[in-house]
Amino acid sequence: MKNLFIYALFLVSILGFSQAEASHWYFGDGAGIIFDLETGTVTSTNAAQNTIDTFEGCSSISDFNGNLLFYTDGRNVWDKNYSIMPNANYSLGTGLMGDPSSTSSGLIVPKPGNPNEYYVFTVDEPHHQNSFAFPNQGPADEFGISTEFYTNPFGSVPEDDDGFNNGLAYSLVDLTLNNGNGDVVTSEKNIQLLTYNPNEQEEESYKCAEKITAVEHSDKQSYWVITHFIDNFYAFRVDSNGVETTPVITNINPLISTSGYRRNGIGYIKASPDGSKIAICHSQNGNQAGGDSDNGSTWIYDFDNSSGILSNPLNLVSNVSQYGVEFSPDSSKLYTSGGGTVLQFDLDAVNPELSFFELAFGFSFFGALQLGPDGKIYVANNEDPFSLDVINFPNELGVDAGYNAYQMNLSSGSSGLGLPPFIQSFFLASIQFENSCVDINTEFSVNSTQAYDSILWDFGDGTDTSTENAPSHTYTSAGTYTVSAEITAGTEVSTFSETIIISSNPIANLADDIDICDDDNDGVMSFDFVAPQTQVLAEQDPTEFTVSYHLSQDDADTNSGALSLPYQ
């Protein structure tokens, strides 16, 4: 053995900065919960804050200190004072194009580079009686004859629906309008996006599924907003210039029929917090307009958050009604709801579709699954709409995940099927640092999904500070240090910290020479370098260091071309 390289990489997750944007949840019939990230408490909202009534779709957003900014049911937008914004009031004819009966009627995405502007993406309910009337205003019967009321469920225009399937659209909220309470910008309101073939009338009459999710782009300066229709995924990029209206389209299994799309379009879509996966639930794949079927499914895909392309479809659940889906904070587990069960899938298993665990079973319908800023997953359970079930340790397998029914009491209001979705990357805030040894440059960076104006680092050793986004610092003594980062965005200042351990430089001790003999004279000799590892590390903790072997000093210096073990 001639060459040895020891390499250590540390990634420390923190609770702060990005997660705080998901601090306020408003959903159901006057229900809501608030996360206090400083104390770790979760409380139900009071009666004065109960200003929403939606059975499914909803979305909310806070600033990076956890202060409420606004929330929506996809039609109305309420400001931080719980008042409907003037240019987003459905009953007054100024509403948005979502629907409270759409699975994900709204999703709020910050406009990169502008802390005062947010996009509200809306997805309408694709109603078959609007499709029957297309291109005219619904409702209509199956023969296209106009009717006064909807029959499934009962309702009328304009009180319950505008008579059109509006598909995916977006509107811009400017928080500087309306005396600083925010309002929708008229020139960027209800901008419809193309998620269908305009040459196919039936596609155009439905336009889009009730599904929408968002995740950070690999450049960390923009987002992907993703939806689905029939057998296509549509990924729209949002950057500092606005919404790119030409999507990245991935045509991939399964094919969901438009024949029963009123029900076929139901179900959640979620991106994993690390941006590597997309999971989607299809409530059913029936062929009767407005009819029910039991042939639902859940699928998971690899996602390239550089290109926006999905690949490698894997069917996890078949022939069962599916509704909610959510990833664990570390993206290693997937949870699904529907058909009276909540299931957990181990995505690290060789065959994830075979590695599942039933966490909950009920005679009613389990609704949305939503990851919270406290790292727990909250579950809408129709059996008791005055509370939420909680998965307390979603990174853990099986019973260790800690499923607890009725854990989160809703002191006012009740839940429906929906809970507010967020940009999944909000739940992946972290300080990253490489090289935690004495007399070696330790490289720091902060993973943030929101633009900021400045950052001030304090490395905790009483020496210097830095205002660089990705600074390096050299510690001269081993020990435990508290590193803090003070981030300024506009007038808001947020400080968070993390404890790191700086170790003495690792020592690669020379192991004994290895004598190898080609006993069977076949020209192949095996080298087992695992056994000498004890000699290489000596008294150093093998759980803290990785030993790798290389054919050249250059490879060792660049930590490339590590030999696989055993080596032949």
What positions do the PLM features span?
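A short beta-strand segment in extracellular, disulfide-stabilized domains
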Residues: 439-448, 522-535
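Beta-propeller fold recognition
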Residues: 19-432
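Extracellular/lumenal mature domains of secreted and surface-exposed proteins
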Residues: 424-507
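Acidic, glycine-anchored loop motifs typical of Ca2+
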Residues: 462-463, 515-525
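Solvent-exposed loop segments of extracellular immunoglobulin-like
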Residues: 449-456, 531, 535-551
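Surface-exposed, flexible coil segments in extracellular/virion-facing regions
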Residues: 454-473, 541, 550-568
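Short beta-strand segments of immunoglobulin-like
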Residues: 431-437, 512-519
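Bacterial Sec-dependent N-terminal signal peptides
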Residues: 1-24, 321-323, 427-428, 437, ...
